[in-house]
Amino acid sequence: MGKQCEVCGKKPQVGHHVSHSNIKTKRRFEPNLQSVRHQLPSGEVKTVTVCTRCLRSGAVTKPVVRKSA
């Protein structure tokens, strides 16, 4: 999948670079995406690409890491 959050669907937006002389050229604002391991309600662990807002809001639950003795 491209540069898109798998939870909220956030995608790149288009804007402009604006120079000192006010010349505008196109640019892209990319979302801050991170690949994290997500634990599904069934207990399955899957790697998903999510934006940092979804991570901070708790939309993604990380799996519990258990230390072996």
UniProtKB/Swiss-Prot annotation:
One of its GO terms (biological process) is translation. One of its GO terms (molecular function) is structural constituent of ribosome. One of its GO terms (cellular component) is ribosome. Gene3D superfamilies: Ribosomal protein L28/L24. Keywords: Ribonucleoprotein, Ribosomal protein. NCBIfam families: L28. Belongs to the bacterial ribosomal protein bL28 family. PANTHER family: 50S RIBOSOMAL PROTEIN L28, LARGE RIBOSOMAL SUBUNIT PROTEIN BL28A. This is Large ribosomal subunit protein bL28. It comes from Nitratidesulfovibrio vulgaris (strain ATCC 29579 / DSM 644 / CCUG 34227 / NCIMB 8303 / VKM B-1760 / Hildenborough) (Desulfovibrio vulgaris). The gene is rpmB.
